[in-house]
Structure formats: structure tokens, C-alpha cells
């Protein structure tokens, strides 16, 4: 099944959570923080401005992005976890 976002929405595959601390201690599942970055796997067609003009997406598939802690909606498709969020929820592109 393929996910195809609509309008100005983006589908992000979150990076895996850290398993160990820098000192080598294993972090239990309850202590893991959700990562705030991931890779874009799909983008919508863009946002329609008030004038009716279609504004292209600045985010492209394959880019690594930084987003807010509470951004997006979590979905699971065929055992894989994704976030669906608006392009405006993305803070930066990571190089």
C-alpha cells in the first residue's frame, strides 16, 4: 500500500529512537524520547493560495527534516510507523 499525501501534507519516516546513552547504558522503552527528525518519503501537490494559484512544496522526497515534538499524526502502515504533517510543521531541512 502506498501513502499519497494530499495538498500541503508530508509523510515522514521518523528516525529510530536512541537505544543506548553515550555512556553505554541501555535506555528502557519508557525512557526513550521520540526523535524529532526523519526522512521525507512522500509529499503532496502543494497548497492552494487565496488567489487560486498552486504553491509548490519546498520539501522534497528523500530530504531529512527537523520537526516539532508534537508535530504530525502518527500512522502505522504494514508494520512501518510514519508521521503525516503539514509542510509548515517542518522547522528545517538537515544537510
Swiss-Prot record:
Subcellular compartments: Cytoplasm
Span of the signal peptide: none
One CC-aspect GO term: cytoplasm
Principal location: cytoplasm
Alphabetic keyword roster: Chaperone, Cytoplasm
GO terms classed as biological process: chaperone cofactor-dependent protein refolding
Assembly notes: Heptamer of 7 subunits arranged in a ring. Interacts with the chaperonin GroEL.
One Gene Ontology MF term: unfolded protein binding
Stored PANTHER family: 10 KDA HEAT SHOCK PROTEIN, CO-CHAPERONIN GROES
Similarity comment: family membership: Belongs to the GroES chaperonin family.
Protein name (database record): Co-chaperonin GroES
HAMAP family per record: CH10
Pfam families cross-referenced by the UniProt entry: Cpn10 (PF00166)
Higher taxonomy: Bacteria, Pseudomonadati, Chlorobiota, Chlorobiia, Chlorobiales
Coiled-coil intervals, chain numbering: none
Function of the molecule: Together with the chaperonin GroEL, plays an essential role in assisting protein folding. The GroEL-GroES system forms a nano-cage that allows encapsulation of the non-native substrate proteins and provides a physical environment optimized to promote and accelerate protein folding. GroES binds to the apical surface of the GroEL ring, thereby capping the opening of the GroEL channel.
